[in-house]
Amino acid sequence: MSIVVTGASGLFGRATVAGLLERMPAGEIIAMTRQPAKLADMAAKGVDVRQGDFDDPDSLERAFAGAQKMLLISASLVGKRIPQHRNAIEAAAAAGVEHVIYTSYVGRGDDQNASLAVSDHRGTEKLLRESGRRWTVLRNTQYTEAVIEAQAPHALRTGRWIACAGDGRMAQVTREDCVACAIAVLTTPGHEDVVYNITGPELMSFRDIAAVISEIAERPIEYVVVDDEGMYAFFDSLGIPRDASKEEVVNGIPWSSDDMVSVERAIRLGQMEILTDHVQQLTGRRPQSLRALAWARRDELRIAG
């Protein structure tokens, strides 16, 4: 059985390929990337590295040829994802891929959800259901790493955690746990036409998170609630673009204020308050908590700023 992983030179894709190498022959792994040179180390291990671009449908069909399963790692740009994912799903069908596993995003309400990202992901899920392929959807929640790497440092420097999410809650999950779930679905039977919500072990507000980061970093942080316009002003002050099609990458994490403000609005409205045991179901282990990851990275947090 051959498995193709899209976006294989990114953080999620590279970790997935590394995990697959521990479970199956390298020659059965196809790693797709726009820039094959970035995966020279994987090619040296025998992985079949292929060039492919979501904006070039012909390249996708070539990249997917011979694969039975595909991990479709979602593209990053809000508003551009759906046409890019349509290209990938249509190419998978043309190449004879039997089962597509997709990294989506949690959220209640689907069309009524305030998050722009949720709208994009539900659009892709609809394409999958209509594709004639077997499918599995992994609705990942916010990465814990995004909180620790992209949000906490500014709060530690300034002593203020600014948010428009109010006291709404979300169950952040580590990228490592998300990758482990993807690998489990790719390498074990029984996941066809199923939606999994991949969450951490605990629902937390940003107020809760600020308190944890403050405690572990041993530095005071005030939680400051603003309205949506106040949140836009905060992101403007950081130089982050508003337009979600021009996201700024910070520590490997794409940011745009349209995207982030809409997510925090959805959190405030309770639309992201989802907690499951799907990580444990798929991997046999409990997901890592935000506190545990923050403690493991406490030295970084204590020197932040």
Give residue spans per PLM region:
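Oxidoreductase cofactor-interface core, primarily capturing Rossmann-like NAD(P)-dependent enzymes
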Residues: 1-38, 55-58, 63-65, 76-83, ...
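Redox-cofactor binding/interface segments in oxidoreductases and associated redox assembly factors
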Residues: 69-73, 102
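Residues lining the SAM
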Residues: 6, 73, 284
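Rossmann-fold cofactor-recognition segment
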Residues: 43-56
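A short hydrophobic/small-residue beta-strand
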Residues: 49, 99-100
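A hydrophobic C-terminal alpha-helical subdomain
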Residues: 229-305
